[in-house]
Structure formats: structure tokens, C-alpha cells
């Protein structure tokens, strides 16, 4: 019953009517993390993701789905979503209790975590692919492949015994999981893409600027090119000199901003006398083929230039208006 509850909890969220989608590769998946500190304290967290965009959360206190966007319901009705929330609450309780009952036989296991990633992928021109992966304390434990539960290599006897149990005594669970990740999940994903197409396919231009800081202990200078606020995620940023990419350019991870856009910084370490002639080039689909190029030594962005021009003009206009008003008041007197 433990894994039956677990599978239903993790996978019943996706569902809905069919819709059109034209993505070469796109996925929807649920991530769940169950933390067990001791026999009497446990906490579960859940979230739903469209590729790398979080679309759903789970409120553990109220036992409700959190819809992070106005299109996160996809094609589900409110009644269907209410039924799912009830299932989530019921199975969360049962899952937590059963895990604690098993873990109580060996107190040395506390604290521990169980992590799950389950969902589906759509590839252009191919059949949908479903996946269900379970980890224990961050290490792969088992996965669902085709119609069979498979233990991860080197996972030990625990995963092997669980997989044997699922494969031979819970055929109904296996069939349910197969249908959910191969049929229900793709339908929900297509509905989600249709409902959120304006958001998912939007183009947001990056803001770019340059900065520098000394390199500790080397006497070198670190030149930093920042690109922020862009969407979608794919972006190309690099340091150049005379149209040649500079070796030694270090790219950081592309990180999410709170508004769903992305941020990247690219660093080049140079001698203090070498920055002249360097530039940073930013290429993104939102720019329509017109790359942003920032030259070191001339690195006021257009926003800053506009600010430098506009602020004095605003001050001048305010002074003129105040002077006219003051003069008119004096004339009346």
C-alpha cells in the first residue's frame, strides 16, 4: 500500500483534455521531497514544473494546490482540481504514516529524505515518454522503465526487494502508473501549453551592463558582463576583442529571477593594463538578430545614457514651471 499511495499522490495531478502544442521538446514533472526527522515529525513538499518554470506548489498546512499562474489549471475544471486536492491530502497522510511505521523498526535511519521526480516528456514527431524516479537521501533508488520497476545500480537490497514486490504483487499499480505518465500526463501537458502559450512563448529582451573587481591575490582584474531579465532561457554571452572570442571566458550558471526571467554573468580575468579593446556581446532570440555589444571603457548602457539626459531636463522643466508660477504670483500682488 505504501507505494500505491505514493504513486497516486505523485502522479494524479496531471490530467485534462487534449490541446495542440508544437514544442520540439517539453516536459511536465512533479517534484516531491519528504523529510523525516524522527518518528513523530515529518514534512512533505511538492511542486509542479513546465520544463524549468514552476507552475504549481503545494500548501502543506491547508492541503491545497497552489496555482502560480492564471493558466496553471490547464484544462482541468474546478471540480476535478478539488477531487485531486482531496486525494493529495488523503494519500499524504497515509504515505507519511506508513513510512514512519516502517522506519520505526530502525531508529538509526533518522533523519532521512525521500525524493521523487515523476512526469512526462513530449518530443516532436515521437510518442510521449513517461518517467518516475525515486531517490533516498539524494541517491538513486529505483525507477519505472516501460512497464517494469528497476532498481538503480548499486542501490542495495532495499530497492531490489521493493521492485520485486511492485513487479509481482502490485500489477495494478504498475498499470496505473503506466497510464498516468504515458496518457494522463501528456494530455495535461498539452492543455497547460495551450492555456499558457502567451506566457510560455513570450520574448523578453535582456538588460546588459559591465562591472569589474580586483582578482584576489593575483593582481589581475575581473571583468564581469551581466545579462538579466531575458526570456526564454537560451542565451549567448561572451567577451570579445576584435571580433574574436576570448579564451578563458568563464560562464556562470543561468539563474532564475523572481519574475520568471533569467540572469547570467560572464567573467574574464585580464591584466590591469589589458582591458582596452574588449567588448561583451549578448545574443538572444528577443533581439531580432541585433546583438547587444558593450565596449569596456564605454560601458554606460543606453538606459544610463537616457537617465543622464532625462533627469537634468526634468529638473530644468520643474524650475521653469516654478519660476513662471512665482512670477505670476508676484504680478498679482
UniProtKB/Swiss-Prot annotation:
A GO-annotated cellular component: Golgi apparatus
Protein's job: Antigen-presenting protein that binds self and non-self lipid and glycolipid antigens and presents them to T-cell receptors on natural killer T-cells.
Cytoplasmic side stretches: 324-333
Organism (species): Homo sapiens (Human)
Positions annotated with a glycan in the UniProt record: 38, 70, 75, 146
Intrachain S-S bonds: 120-185, 225-280
Annotated ranges, domain Ig-like: 206-296
Signal peptide: 1-17
GO BP annotations listed: adaptive immune response; antigen processing and presentation, endogenous lipid antigen via MHC class Ib; antigen processing and presentation, exogenous lipid antigen via MHC class Ib; immune response; positive regulation of T cell mediated cytotoxicity; T cell activation involved in immune response
TM region positions: 303-323
Other comment: During protein synthesis and maturation, CD1 family members bind endogenous lipids that are replaced by lipid or glycolipid antigens when the proteins are internalized and pass through endosomes or lysosomes, before trafficking back to the cell surface.
Protein localization: Cell membrane; Endosome membrane; Lysosome
Distribution of this protein across tissues and organs: Expressed on cortical thymocytes, on certain T-cell leukemias, and in various other tissues.
Protein name (Swiss-Prot/TrEMBL): T-cell surface glycoprotein CD1c
InterPro entries, per database record: Ig-like_dom (IPR007110), Ig-like_dom_sf (IPR036179), Ig-like_fold (IPR013783), Ig_C1-set (IPR003597), MHC_class-I_related (IPR050208), MHC_I-like_Ag-recog (IPR011161), MHC_I-like_Ag-recog_sf (IPR037055), MHC_I/II-like_Ag-recog (IPR011162)
Example of a GO MF term: glycolipid binding
Short motif (Internalization signal): ranges: 329-332
Ranges in the topological domain labelled Extracellular: 18-302
Subunit-level organization: Heterodimer with B2M (beta-2-microglobulin).
One Pfam family this sequence matches: MHC_I_3
Keywords per UniProt: Adaptive immunity, Cell membrane, Disulfide bond, Endosome, Glycoprotein, Immunity, Immunoglobulin domain, Lipid-binding, Lysosome, Membrane, Signal, Transmembrane, Transmembrane helix
Topology versus the membrane: Single-pass type I membrane protein
